């Protein structure tokens, strides 16, 4: 394509007159006269600016987009011109639609982006040349270069267009044992996954996985294509299973996650295998298959321990605690939650600490261990204050308030049951101040022993009175 320096701004008389009469002028001039004057200008420029042909003058006068299109047609690249023109039309349509939706949409028209036009011209024409020679690998490489160039948030639809072209061409390439086809399936899977079409994405990722089995192919960064296929399939299967679990399709979700687990083992990546086990365990928990869930989650914890991955191990303890809680095994659930709290604290995982403390507090509160519940909820609340998270702060504050109320409840009940003047005075004093209610300091044996036991060991008394079965088990 010819590019010329700007012409001098000093204009001869003919040029100055012509600028006033060209179509951009507001005057109404007959078309025949304009054509004649245009020819006169071309002749004048050809005579007075030596070395400028009529085509070069036209190249200077026309827009960059028009020059690109003219060059394509003049050089015989009719397919490239057709594809470029269709892309420009769609570009303008999308730009107009976006402009209507948002007043602040700032993407430039394609004709105002010469770098992109240059890329399109260069690689489309080279791809067309290669197609004429039936060199399909070169066709694919040129189209793939365009897909990579347009891999950004604004131009993603252009990238997807060239991914689709690459996919069609890759199926014609036979000399690489299917590597290009495998990569094309990977890109098509990504295209559908980003669009939320998970079933279509899974189909392409399955084909990608099948084509890479037993191969040592690597991508541009040196990563194994088979490992990438396993990761892509696991990610898609997990997203599919999430939707199935939302719809309470537990059997289908478990089935697809078992398949994901098998693929993860094939990939020989322990981290990936652990992730598959974790989500499979959660699916069994949702389906109320508790024993199976415990078995699978135990496998996850063992792999996490082997990998020395504390954060994953903490997540496993949390999941196991949920299963045990669902089974009514509160004592065992508390053990795992304490481990989860310890890991979260040691690794400065504040959100995990809030979640673990809240779960632990809920169990203590349910069992009537109000002092311990209050301590757990206070820990959760203090952590949310450090995080400056208002929604979490409000939630933990409610839990903490309920636990404190339960903690005070036993002392208040004992004052009421005593039914004497001193107890009444304490209750009235507390009602006025609404502070922490103090135990009765009266030294009588029956009152002192009762209040002291309530204030210092309320959770132990509750265990004796309300959960005799648990006490027997402990002894």
Curated annotation (Swiss-Prot):
Major subcellular site? cytoplasm
* A cellular component annotation (GO) from this entry: cytoskeleton
Which residues fall in a coiled-coil region?
none
Task: List the Gene3D superfamilies.
Answer: Tetratricopeptide repeat domain
InterPro entries according to UniProt = Bac_ResReg_Asp_Phosphatase, TPR-like_helical_dom_sf, TPR_rpt
Domain free text: The TPR repeats are required for axonemal localization and flagellar beating.
Related disease?
Spermatogenic failure 42: An autosomal recessive infertility disorder characterized by almost immotile spermatozoa due to multiple morphologic abnormalities of the flagella, including short, absent, coiled, and bent flagella. Some spermatozoa also show abnormalities of the head, acrosome, midpiece, or endpiece.
Q: What is this protein called?
A: Tetratricopeptide repeat protein 29
- Organism name: Homo sapiens
């Amino acid at each position: 394509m010819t590019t010329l320096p700007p012409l001098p701004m000093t204009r001869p008389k003919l040029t100055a007159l012509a600028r006033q009469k060209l179509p951009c002028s507001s005057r109404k001039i007959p078309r025949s006269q304009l054509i004649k004057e245009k020819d006169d200008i071309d002749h004048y420029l050809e005579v007075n600016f030596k070395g400028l042909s009529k085509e070069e003058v036209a190249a200077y006068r026309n827009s960059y987009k028009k020059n690109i299109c003219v060059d394509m047609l003049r050089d015989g690249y009719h397919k490239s011109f057709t594809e470029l023109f269709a892309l420009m039309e769609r570009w303008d349509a999308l730009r107009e639609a976006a402009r209507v939706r948002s007043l602040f949409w700032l993407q430039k028209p394609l004709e105002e982006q010469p770098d992109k036009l240059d890329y399109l011209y260069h690689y489309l024409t080279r791809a067309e040349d290669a197609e004429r020679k039936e060199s399909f690998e070169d066709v694919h490489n040129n189209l793939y270069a365009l897909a990579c160039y347009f891999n950004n948030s604004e131009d993603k639809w252009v990238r997807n267009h060239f991914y689709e072209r690459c996919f069609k061409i890759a199926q014609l390439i036979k000399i690489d044992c299917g590597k290009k086809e495998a990569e094309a399936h990977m890109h098509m899977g990504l295209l559908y996954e980003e669009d939320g079409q998970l079933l279509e994405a899974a189909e392409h990722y399955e084909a990608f996985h099948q084509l890479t089995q037993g191969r040592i192919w690597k991508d541009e960064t040196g990563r194994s294509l088979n490992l990438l296929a396993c990761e892509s399939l696991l990610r898609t299967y997990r997203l599919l299973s999430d939707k199935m679990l939302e719809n309470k399709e537990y059997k289908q979700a478990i089935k697809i996650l078992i398949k994901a687990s098998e693929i993860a083992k094939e990939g020989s990546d322990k981290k990936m295998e652990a992730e598959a086990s974790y989500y499979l365990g959660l699916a069994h928990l949702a389906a109320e298959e508790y024993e199976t869930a415990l078995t699978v989650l135990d496998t996850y914890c063992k792999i996490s321990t082997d990998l020395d991955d504390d954060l994953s191990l903490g997540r496993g303890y949390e999941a196991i605690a949920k299963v045990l809680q669902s089974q009514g095994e509160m004592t065992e659930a508390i053990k795992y939650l304490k481990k989860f709290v310890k890991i979260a604290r040691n690794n400065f995982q504040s959100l995990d600490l809030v979640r673990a403390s809240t779960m632990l507090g809920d169990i203590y509160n349910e069992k009537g261990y109000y002092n311990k519940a209050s301590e757990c909820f206070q820990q959760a609340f203090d952590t949310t204050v450090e995080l400056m998270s208002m929604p979490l702060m409000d939630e933990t504050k409610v839990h903490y308030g309920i636990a404190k109320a339960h903690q005070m409840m036993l002392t208040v009940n004992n004052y009421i049951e005593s039914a004497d003047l001193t107890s009444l005075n304490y209750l009235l004093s507390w009602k006025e101040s609404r502070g922490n209610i103090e135990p009765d300091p009266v030294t009588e044996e029956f009152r002192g022993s009762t209040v002291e036991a309530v204030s210092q060991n309320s959770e132990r008394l509750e265990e004796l009175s309300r959960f005799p079965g648990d006490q027997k088990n402990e002894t």
